[in-house]
């Protein structure tokens, strides 16, 4: 609207993509868009390898961080099968909840199997965080025979999800034998690590714009979070993730700054005006 109001024709053309499902895997969002795009005749395709792709889905409070790399997102699902019985006769059952608790602690030791560090990222290591736990029994007086939990893994580039799965199975086999239960572990969801060259044209253009608008020295960084930029990079499209945000997502008092949003728009306009 501002470009039209000022009758300005920028050096670069502007395209906006709005998509759904970013929080739940992108199957019905950008992944769907890219799948349909690949099916178009060559002359109708609108995504080009020499375009700039900027995803405003991550950043820092100062605006200095330009995300160029993402860890692999790998979710493990762990199913523990024991024997259900009345809680007053625990000797008749196999408590899957207790075995599951031991399995949680075993999964938290996975970092010892993958100790490599990369200073581009914060934190600089692969992370293994037990997160969601499914409901087991509806009543307090029931010893649970089944327990399910999930582990959120963020893996540095070069750490293969299949190797993490193998390591988890080795550790959980010992837990299963000790508690007399069966433990199955599988990859529930996986988004591979992705990277855009730190000296790519889109990053260079963003650095110039951020320096002029925010008066800070922009720098390339890597993150553990997963954004739709990974899907673009997997298609050979150079994507940079940038915005000025307070990084309060998924926590109490989640918020954004209108002032920062307006200045972010100035950064995007700056990129459009560069030759």
Predicted regions and their residues:
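Metal-dependent amide/peptide-bond hydrolase catalytic core
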Residues: 24, 58-62, 68, 74-275
């Amino acid at each position: 609207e501002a470009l039209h109001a000022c009758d300005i024709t920028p050096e670069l053309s502007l395209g906006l993509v709005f998509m759904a499902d970013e929080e739940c895997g992108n199957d019905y969002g950008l992944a769907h868009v890219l799948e349909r795009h690949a099916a178009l005749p060559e002359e109708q395709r609108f995504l080009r390898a020499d375009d700039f792709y900027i995803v405003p889905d991550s950043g820092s409070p100062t605006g200095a961080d330009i995300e160029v790399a993402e860890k692999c997102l790998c979710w493990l699902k762990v199913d523990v099968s024991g024997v259900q019985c009345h809680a007053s006769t625990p000797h008749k059952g196999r408590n899957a909840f207790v075995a599951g608790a031991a399995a949680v602690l075993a999964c938290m030791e996975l970092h010892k199997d993958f100790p490599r560090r990369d200073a581009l990222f914060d934190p600089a290591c692969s992370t293994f965080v037990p997160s969601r736990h499914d409901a087991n029994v509806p009543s307090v007086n029931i010893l649970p025979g089944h327990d399910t939990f999930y582990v959120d893994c963020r893996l540095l580039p070069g750490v293969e999800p299949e190797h993490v799965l193998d390591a988890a199975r080795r550790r959980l086999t010992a837990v299963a034998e000790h508690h007399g239960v069966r433990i199955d572990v599988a990859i529930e969801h996986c988004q591979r690590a992705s990277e855009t060259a730190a000296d790519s044209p889109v990053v260079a253009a963003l650095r110039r714009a951020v320096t002029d608008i925010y008066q800070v020295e922009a720098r390339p960084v890597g993150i553990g979070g997963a954004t739709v930029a990974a899907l673009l990079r997997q298609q050979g499209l150079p994507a940079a993730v940038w915005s000025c945000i307070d990084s309060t997502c998924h926590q109490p008092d989640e918020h954004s700054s209108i002032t920062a949003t307006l200045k972010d728009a100035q950064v995007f306009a700056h990129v459009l005006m560069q030759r």
